[in-house]
């Protein structure tokens, strides 16, 4: 029996309703005559506090509030990829067709998945009537896009992963809509019809069998990220930075070039023109791993700053639920959230309207636990169903601290829960050094875990070279103060070599043009070769300096090769690595000729 109450008070996106006996926490309710979507966030006696995911302008006391009896859930099934949704997973293209308007009308109800489209269903050949099935067992597959084969699973909220149901019937191969029954199972004496889609509550993590340490790097094609501060598949990372430092471009680079199988891009409370830019450009980008259009592996959730504040909070959970769903199929999914600061501001706004006690800078006291809930849904895991498979959810989120202050609550709490911290620096951005990742503040706790992959697939010397590159950059930072005070002439010859090598690292390796067709994506092999040239140059030059050869002489001898190395970012394609091998040989030859 649906709960029926009425509006008592309206405070922006928060509505207080009375006569709500029997309503449950996080239950979805329809508010007002237009049936606006809301979620119960607090219950006191017969009163319920509801956060509404649509504009509440014009709602008056006394209007009806009707419970739906279920928590806020999203539809999971074929038809999610290559589409754009709003913060509560309503497809924007369908809304545009129904509303005949560029704006989302209040109370509009459009299903997330297309009910009329027919999909090519292929049943699992290993299953037959009478077999026992559990939650997350694969019933069959659907080619959702040319890149992704959608695996239709037994919903774990219909048949638990630790229980068994009997398969009564499995649909033969053919074309079906998502509303057609594709299997019938008997569980606890009841026959249950299964369809290609099911609903899942966004605040509830999907079950896993066991979680593993992430050991495979997420290859992004960005040299400073892959080599100095690597992210692992199943890892968590944050990109904090002040206004204009390049957060959105860095995240877009991750979405476009990373080797994740499925990318969910959540624009949470950011500007509408940034989301428009993604929409305009992504269909033209090609996936570097397959050559297919990028949209075939991407889901976009647009929840811009002019959309209702409450929907920002939901959009983050919607995104991570989609990522977990594709992880359960055995894929590596990447969730990109831009930005969690706007999400935290939405929490602050709603908490203020609910008259909750504020904590630091007005944020609610539970900010840290909400951030922890979100980041803990990342990970590499074994999925409980059959056939056995392993998938991962990687989370990379932007943080927008006001004025670039990393001590503010959202950034400081985020640092506790993420293992990769890519700190963007306004001074580097203003100096046109992009990506503006500060190598002195940033860190990655996955360096040792992903080193094995680099050693087995690229070179056993990867970690040795990477650590030496970091130590050169750290030494150069110590020397910069001396150079500022007394000039570079006062430095010893070994210190001058550190300064010169650090300059080459910054110009040839750390800087990267996200809009150049060649430099936008740098393969792991090219990254290693460029690093090898720089570090072996430094080692050989150090021997010469110790033998009495001045740094000025070394610089003059290899100036053409250094210029060519810097140009190689734009001139050497990922499949033309013999050019870098040739450049390495010329470097060593020139340096050998200087031996006293």
Swiss-Prot record:
It is found in: Cell membrane. One of its GO terms (molecular function) is ATP binding. One of its GO terms (biological process) is proton motive force-driven plasma membrane ATP synthesis. It comes from the Archaea. The keyword Protein biosynthesis does not apply. The keyword Ion transport applies. ATP binds at residues 241-248. It catalyses: ATP + H2O + 4 H(+)(in) = ADP + phosphate + 5 H(+)(out). GO terms for cellular component: plasma membrane. Its EC number is 7.1.2.2. SMART domains: AAA. It is a peripheral membrane protein. Keywords: ATP synthesis, ATP-binding, Cell membrane, Hydrogen ion transport, Ion transport, Membrane, Nucleotide-binding, Translocase, Transport. It is an enzyme of class 7 (translocase). InterPro entries: AAA+_ATPase, ATP-synt_VA_C, ATP-synth_a_Xtn, ATP_synth_asu-like_sf, ATPase_a/bsu_AS, ATPase_F1/V1/A1_a/bsu_N, ATPase_F1/V1/A1_a/bsu_N_sf, ATPase_F1/V1/A1_a/bsu_nucl-bd. Gene3D superfamilies: 2.40.30.20, 2.40.50.100, Bovine Mitochondrial F1-atpase, Atp Synthase Beta Chain, Chain D, domain 3, P-loop containing nucleotide triphosphate hydrolases. Component of the A-type ATP synthase that produces ATP from ADP in the presence of a proton gradient across the membrane. The A chain is the catalytic subunit. Belongs to the ATPase alpha/beta chains family. Has multiple subunits with at least A(3), B(3), C, D, E, F, H, I and proteolipid K(x). NCBIfam families: PRK04192.1. This is A-type ATP synthase subunit A.
